[in-house]
Amino acid sequence: MSGNQREIRANTWAGVKREDEPTVTLVSGYKVRDVTFSKNEACPTFMLANINPRFDIDYNLSHIEDIVQVAHKVGANILVFPELCISGYVWDTDHKAEVQEQLKTSHNNQPEVKKVLDGIKSGLVDHDKGLNMVFFGNVRMDRSHGKIHDSTFVMTQGADYNDIFYDKIFLTPMEKLFFHRGSDRRLVLDARFGRMGVMMCYDLCFVEMGKMYAFTDEVDVMITTAAWRMETVREYPLLKLRIDNYYQFIWRLMHSALAAHNQVWSIGANCVGVFEKTGGRFCGESGVWSPSGIPLVHASHDEEELIVIRDLEIRGHMRHQAKEHFDYSLDFDEVYRAIKNIKPKRVSLDGL
């Protein structure tokens, strides 16, 4: 970047002011950033794992077990891990056989994986006074069709986690080398505190999916698991503008847009730090965005951290009521309607 160019710094959250920084403490060796949203203790407490999964299944499983114990200690009700947190992320075609072998040995029914997952499940509760739900990203082997999917599973005490899953629909070009596209079937979860929809990473870039969840399924909150990268450059030389971490910028933008456009909460758990196989970085910043589009709390962009947001009033701030503290003056339900698929009026501007 030349000396007179201006750099857009992606690790500053423009326009969002906070009087006090969230408390950060060490719990069992993990940094925990802890905030409280409301005084309504009947609302759920979320914990988001902003972590760096390795290409090492045993390490990842041990890491996950430790974080689950932290969730118990801090009183979290819902714990969200990032995408492919058991296998580690995929990389290039030169190592395709190695990646495929890793994926095959990390699925939920592999003995060592199943042992850990079943142990976590046995510690869950079926009420609101403890950890009762865990979202985690892993490989799903569809043996009936011989397909491998990049999936998010939902673990509760009373159900088989292999039965509650979402297969990622919008795969990146790299992911298409290793996974099959999901079937377009969304996953909607009804809980006492509200209705949840599940998305994964690149899904955030496709607005139709969020719209379907919000206006057809009427969810209150979107849960997104991700392995979202940080670095790529966008530059406008004549304006002397450059951003080196464009993907990080988009991570924030997409969550804010998803929340504000659809008047839902957006909660994202992302990988963070250097990806050992490529040297590239994941942008972290796992966080919570309110229906206003404003980020309420987020994790580090460069190191592992656990985010806790207590007593999150999901249903009390959903889009139907339009009582969230934002500047929309019109109620979505009174104004919004689907746009009919009719031909546009086209006008030729002669000479222009």
Where are the regions a protein language model picked out?
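N-terminal active-site segment of His-dependent metallophosphoesterases
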Residues: 15-78, 223
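Active-site-proximal beta-strand/loop segments in catalytic clefts of secreted hydrolases
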Residues: 51, 83, 137-140, 169, ...
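Active-site beta-strand/loop signature of hydrolases that rely on acidic residues for catalysis
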Residues: 60, 68-98, 134-136, 203, ...
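A charged helix-plus-loop insertion that forms the helical arch/lid used to bind
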Residues: 94-111
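CN hydrolase (nitrilase-like) catalytic-core segments centered on the catalytic cysteine
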Residues: 107-136, 204-306
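Active-site catalytic loop in hydrolytic enzyme cores
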Residues: 141-237, 242-253, 318-328
